[in-house]
Amino acid sequence: MKFIHGLTAGVSLAIVVSCSASKPYSGDEIPNGGVGGGGGGFISGSGGSATGGGGGCTSSTQCTPGYTCDNGTCVAPEVETNRGLGDAPPVATPRYVYALNPTAASVARIDPTTLQIEAVPVGPHPVGLAALPAEDAAVVLSLDDGSLSVLDSATLPTKVTRVALQRQYGKLTLSPDGKFAAAWPDPALAPASGAEGIFALVDLAKVRAGTTGSVQERAGGYRITNVIFRTQAGVSTALHVFAKSTVSTFDLVTGAALPARLALPASMSADVRSREVVASADGRIIMLRSTVAPELASFDGTRIDTVPLPEIATDLDLVPDGTAAVAALRSSGSVAYIEVPADLITPAGIDTISLGDGGVVGQIALPPQVPGTGMFALVYSTVTDAETFARIDLPSGVVTRYALEKKVDEIALSPDGRSALIIHKADPATTAVDPYEAAVDRDQGFSVFDVNSGFWQLQRTGSTRPTRFAFSPAGGFVGVALRDDALRRFQLMAVNLTSLVSTTLPLASTPLFMGTVPQAPGVTPHRVFVSQDHPAGRISVIQLDTGQVRTATGFTLNGEID
């Protein structure tokens, strides 16, 4: 049944504490969508101007693509972090962390317990790195020689099996069961040898067995943007390749060379730079968000349907079990709650949940897993001056707003959904009269939020901002990396998410990436790793609960422990 919610349950306040800190790392940002990350995160810059793209308007069609018409003004798209940067971050397996060393054409296999390092040779200029599921193995894509390497560390030294891909590719996607890899062109660059839409489908079982026919080139359409594997009962059965105006489905069971191909709705191919594609973990549910028309599209593997919305959505996310989608409707300050598949078949059943308090909904943050206490969304905007965010219980639509002391740049929820990290942005043009409040506005910083109680705590970081973060595997702690290049000050803040208290720990050099170290018997579950800028390669393993920092330097040497 379709209905409109607008229930506000209250406001939470908190106490401000101060601390000094360091300088930011500027990274890639993308408007209207992005690539989901793992245990770690990348923190974007401040969202930019809230207006522009055409000035006055009566409809979003009068605005620059990606902008929406809000109250007669073309408003900029929300800024959502792109966690998939050009340089592949390290990845973790049950026992090891693997990190690329592009200049030395190698991968460092690091034991996070002993910090022993093994330099594993791969093809020149490695650009892609992914861990195989549930085993100590990884796959590496190398650009210069167009090769793919499988690293097997079940026994040491690591066994390397390399295969040629016939051409250069910049992107790597693994199937959830680890049976296949897809190497495909970087959508931001011209394809190698002008081969538009050609990608390589690699049978990893054949690669590891040393049999022939492990690499098959396939035609995926013009301008590939997304590659998604579909699994059934834990087995990969199909590969969906989204291009500018088509989606091609390749049958992994029969191995047919030609796909089943469908045309995408015109609204989904009008601006491929900003359209968003989201999928459930098994690839069973795939949805697309247009930035030029008030509609979504759904793809179930065989057909595409459009789903009308009352306005252009500024964000789209699937709940973890794929049973519903949540779309941000910024102009009306509401979200659309779409039950899957019922509301895809009968869009009249879509629920519209209004904040009811004048708040803005530009971005949505959902828990990585469905909480035992029920699903909810944290909603906020990156292009307004609001120093608030709201929780929406789903599907009931109960809204609780929380007042903060600073503007919101990003919100990320912990693996257990009990805590959230709120990254703030500075306001150098603050008009606050109180000198203390003005200083808080000008500072960078972050807040940690306890979902159940509604309590939050601000951590100020002075004139610089946080750059990376990673939650511990089971929740309970989060690490936030800070940097100040001018002062050569590099730190990590370990935050206890139970007490909301931060502890500052030293880092040896500039933090680049962060990630989670998987839990292991007899070892603290609160370990994260931080890769750092160093000529020979450097990585630190931090125990967030004890504050122990252990650093390994020298990916191309035998390695030395600091």
Which stretches of residues belong to each language-model region?
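Blade-level signature of beta-propeller repeat domains, shared across WD40, Kelch, NHL, RCC1
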Residues: T516, V523, R527-D562
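Repeated scaffold domains used in trafficking and secretory/extracellular systems
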Residues: T81-P89, P124-P133, R167-P176, A219-T231, ...
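Residue position within the beta-strands of beta-propeller blades
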Residues: A99, V140, A183, H240-V241, ...
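Short coil/turn segments that connect the beta-strands within blades of beta-propeller domains
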Residues: P94-R95, E135-D136, D177-K179, G234-T237, ...
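Ser/Thr-rich, Pro/Gly/Ala-heavy low-complexity intrinsically disordered linkers and tails
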Residues: I15-E78, D87-P89
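An edge-strand/N-cap motif at the start of beta-rich repeat modules
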Residues: T73-V120, L129, A138
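A short beta-strand motif characteristic of beta-propeller blades
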Residues: L115-P121, P157-V163, R208-A219, A256-M268, ...
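Short glycine/acidic-enriched loop and turn motifs that connect beta-strands
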Residues: A104-A105, D145-S147, P187-A192, K244-T246, ...
